[in-house]
Amino acid sequence: MTTLEQAVKRFTPLDPDLMAKRLGRPGPMPRVIIDTDTANEIDDQYAVAWALLSQDRIKLEGVTAAPYSFLHHRDGLYEAVAALQDGGGSDHDNKFVGPFTGWAKRLMADGRTADDIEFVTPDVGEERSYEEILRVFEACGVSHEGRVFRGSQEHLPSYEKPVESEAAQFIIDQARNRDDGPVYVLAMGALPNVGSALLMAPDIIDNLVVVWTSGFPSYSPFSNEPSLNLVQDRLSSRLIYECGVPHVYLPGYHVGAQLTISLPEMKQFVKGRGAIGDYLWHLYTNNPLHKKYAISQPETKTWVIWDIINVAWMLDAAYVPTFLTTSPHLDEKLYWQKDPSRHGMLEAYDVARDAIFEDIYRRLETAP
């Protein structure tokens, strides 16, 4: 079986000057592909809509559907519920039940069990994401013909078996269109489409910039296992940091996590702003994750619109401040291992939360 180290040998390191250029600010009307697990929750829809309503600032080449799945949560939740039903002690809870304790307790208080939770498989997640992308295009009054592509229905099985899909081929074709400049892939989910494209065509790293949101800052001491975008496809996640593709890393925890919005804000600035405003309002007030995680009184709580950070970085440098660092190793346990001798990576350290949402609100005012 091909190891990560062996797979990386197929990639020719970029000249440092070209890497620096690719990690600089995008030029006018940059070419963009959005790779999104759109139906995973409700944040991707905001990001896709914002991009569709901002086509005077970016050239949105297409949107590719990424798979998602919560199967990796299933065993932990079942074990947590069983432990609580058996009256496990605190030591047992800490070592065995772990991060699923709160979820399990809320489910039980709601009169439900782990059997009541749907754990979709990646192929179902991809299909739902594809259908959701079409709904967002329609709500924005934009034709999807020739611009929405089906993605991988599984996570990368091995480094010698990239998953062929419309999405992976579209990424390759756009990256090889070098006459039109680099293409920025705004990756908002797990990375099988991107990882497969890179493995199928290692030459594309000279004209591709991966803008990905996931995980903790690269200087964090924590395991990135809590990150849904990162943990689902570990092979592709590790490949991104090793292969030398220009990478703008947008940490979810502590950075993107600031992008919260409340019910009153939704009511005042989003609801009634065209068909897409009403659709985003519907998603917010019928958030499927409220039921899934047994969240009570959702009207008193905000929700993180994580994935708008990708579009924000594309549109305005002031929206997402960054610093130049080196690409860390992501080890098998999903911890960062820093190495100052590595190739460069651009990393976000903050967001201008209010300015970002104000931009979205202005765009919604123009929605059909």
Q: What annotation goes with each model-predicted range?
A:
Residues A39-N40, T121, G125, W303:
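Extracytoplasmic/periplasmic, Sec-exported soluble proteins
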